[in-house]
Each structure stands twice: as structure tokens, then as C-alpha cells.
Amino acid sequence: MEKSKVAASTKANNLAGYIAGAIRENGVAELKAVGGGALNQAVKAIATAREILAPSGIDLATVLAFLADIKMNGEARTAITLTIYAR
């Protein structure tokens, strides 16, 4: 499964819909966030997706991991991957 890139400008509700759909279809969703704003949107989306899936009896668990330093616009940045599982 390909990691969905999250930006600070990503709408959390739209991302929550993506997460809920991926969980229903595959049981897992993967996100990649670079920067605090992007991580904030990802966390809000996971919380919203949990609310969307709760009536179906699906709960979520998330595993976080650092990616190696990546280059963005010539600067070294640290990315965080968020792997969301149904439980």
C-alpha cells in the first residue's frame, strides 16, 4: 500500500474519509507527514476516522515511525509515517 502524503493544508475531514475507506477495504492505511502542521492534520484525521468507523464496531490503532531524513527544497527534514490498523 502506498503512503498518502499529508500537508499542513490537507483538510482533516477529507483525509478522515480516505482513512475510513482504506480501513474498510484493506484493514490498514498509511500516511506520511513532514512538519508539525502536517502531523497535526494527520492526528485530527485519525481521530475523526475513528468516530466515523465506531458505529461499525471498528476501532483504530496507530503505529508511528520516523523516516530517514529527506530533502525538501534543499533542506533536510524528518518525516513521520503513521500506519493505522483496524482492531
Model-based region annotation:
Residues 54-87:
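C-terminal edge-of-domain segments
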Residues 10, 34-37:
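Short beta->alpha linker loops
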Residues 2-28, 42, 46, 50, ...:
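Conserved mixed alpha/beta catalytic, RNA-binding, or beta-rich assembly cores of soluble enzyme
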Residues 36-64:
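Short, hydrophobic/π-rich interface segment
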